[in-house]
């Protein structure tokens, strides 16, 4: 789902929520009813076989390796969860340690209160990311839509700590921080659901189920409001290479808005345009993984 510039007006949201790429069933366990699994429900056990370093609620391991040559951390879109990136993790070559951020208020963190700002998410994530950024292996932060903003803010914070020597940033489906756009407004939940349906990326079975949407909408509303409140510094720059991925039919990002990311790095910049709309990456998983891996292994900064 997209992160719209304006959240739907709604009363105070409940803490219990499930992402649009997964549903809560009875207990704290969840099952994935994701587009990438063909709509089949299964337990969210994507981290099996992964060598975990402690129990960090912010980072869900998706693929581990004994001999790490690079690490990748995915940052989900608004309303999304770590499980969305499990199919991507399986496509990386040997030697890649792959994980995804798990925002509070969804899946195994459903009892935790939401974080209501993009900046707050980056602040809370920083201790977890510091550990990996301090190690002498490439670390690629990959964010899609709202996740691109969280990844960018996280990279800025790592830079303040002088921990970006081995970092790379991949932003996807998101206009550059220097771009100003008119806020999108949704007067009702139905308007928001219609918007999500147009963008794709959400299983139609979930969108058409009132019960599932009751679980998913609190996270969606929270994240959309976070994006609406986000006020990036227009001239902020990171000292890491930036790869920008965009869909050639993405209604949320124009080619010029994607290319504007070039002004937000003092290192290398590359723009890759792929066929598709806002969720183009779901249809090009192998290509996205190849581009991210190439970014990790590039020697130049």
Describe the residue ranges of each PLM region.
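Compositionally biased, low-complexity flexible segments
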Residues: 1-48
């Amino acid at each position: 789902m997209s992160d719209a510039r304006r959240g739907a007006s709604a009363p105070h949201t409940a803490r219990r929520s499930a992402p649009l790429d997964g549903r809560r069933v009875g207990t704290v366990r969840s099952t994935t009813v994701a587009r990438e699994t063909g709509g089949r429900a299964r337990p969210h056990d994507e981290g099996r076989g992964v060598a975990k370093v402690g129990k960090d609620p912010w980072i869900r391991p998706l693929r581990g390796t004994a001999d790490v040559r690079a690490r990748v951390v995915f940052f989900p879109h608004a309303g999304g969860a770590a499980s969305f990136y499990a199919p991507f993790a399986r496509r990386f070559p040997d030697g890649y340690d792959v994980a995804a951020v798990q925002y509070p208020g969804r899946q195994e963190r459903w009892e935790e209160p939401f974080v209501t700002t993009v900046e707050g998410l980056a602040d809370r994530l920083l201790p977890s990311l510091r550990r990996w950024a301090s190690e002498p292996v490439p670390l690629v932060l990959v964010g899609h839509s709202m996740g691109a903003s969280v990844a960018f803010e996280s990279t800025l914070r790592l830079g303040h700590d002088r921990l970006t020597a081995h970092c790379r940033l991949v932003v996807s489906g998101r206009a550059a921080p220097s771009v100003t756009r008119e806020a999108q407004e949704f007067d009702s939940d139905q308007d928001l659901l219609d918007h999500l349906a147009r963008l794709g990326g959400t299983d139609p079975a979930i969108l058409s189920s009132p019960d599932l949407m009751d679980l998913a909408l609190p996270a969606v509303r929270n994240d959309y409001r976070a994006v609406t409140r986000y006020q990036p510094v227009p001239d902020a720059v990171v000292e890491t290479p930036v790869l920008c991925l965009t869909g050639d039919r993405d209604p949320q990002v124009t080619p010029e808005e994607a290319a504007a990311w070039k002004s937000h790095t003092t290192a290398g910049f590359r723009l890759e345009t792929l066929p598709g709309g806002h969720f183009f990456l779901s249809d090009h998983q192998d290509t996205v993984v190849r581009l991210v891996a190439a970014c990790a292994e590039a020697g130049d900064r």
